Amino acid sequence: MMYREPNDSPWGLVVRCDTLCPGVYSVSTAGHGGIMAQIDAARQLLSLEAQQVGFQAGGYLNFEEDCDASVALRELMDSGIIAPRTDNYFRPGEYEACIDRSLQRWNPAYWRARQKRLSVQAAKATKERER
């Protein structure tokens, strides 16, 4: 599949676009922004619960920056596609904690589904180790 960086977004003309991974972009406009994932990339990379948080527009699944972008970021970090941010602002562990607090506040249904999914994965891993 050929991916293309967006020039336009649901929030306006894209003035900055950073590729998070093929088909997934962090975009900024003059006044807003978010995460844009091409539909086929979103279906491959994001859980159904995460996909339900985003909204479709222009061939992308979109997650606005204030409340919903953290869903896409958490999914990409959980799968190891992107690393948690560490820099002069975020020390190790702080970025993930910030993302998790945002999810718990703005997307509690997604947070609960994620926690349940992680519990099931941990139980399966434990069972495999015991064999």
Q: What spans do the regions from the language model cover?
A:
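Sparse, context-dependent recognition of short Cys/His-centered cofactor- or disulfide-binding micro-motifs
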Residues: 10, 20-22, 57, 88-91
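Extended aliphatic helical segments
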Residues: 14-15, 24-27, 53, 71, ...
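A short, structured beta-strand/loop element
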Residues: 29-57
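Short N-terminal "domain-start" leader segments
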Residues: 2-40
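A short, exposed loop/beta-hairpin motif centered on an aromatic-Gly-Thr core
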Residues: 55-65
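Short, compact, well-ordered microdomains
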Residues: 64-121
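Non-Sec secretion/translocation targeting segments of pathogen effectors
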Residues: 125-131
